[in-house]
Amino acid sequence: VLDIYEQKLGQTRVLDIYEQK
């Protein structure tokens, strides 16, 4: 569960940075 949660957070962060840029 932690793995999936971390993966989801990482993906969201990447998308956030991509959108910001």
From Swiss-Prot:
Coiled coil: none annotated. Its EC number is 2.5.1.18. Keywords: Transferase. One of its GO terms (molecular function) is glutathione transferase activity. The keyword Coiled coil does not apply. It catalyses: RX + glutathione = an S-substituted glutathione + a halide anion + H(+). It is an enzyme of class 2 (transferase). Conjugation of reduced glutathione to a wide number of exogenous and endogenous hydrophobic electrophiles. In plants, may have a detoxification role against certain herbicides. Belongs to the GST superfamily. Phi family. This is Glutathione S-transferase 1. It comes from Populus euphratica. The lineage of its organism: Eukaryota, Viridiplantae, Streptophyta, Embryophyta, Tracheophyta.
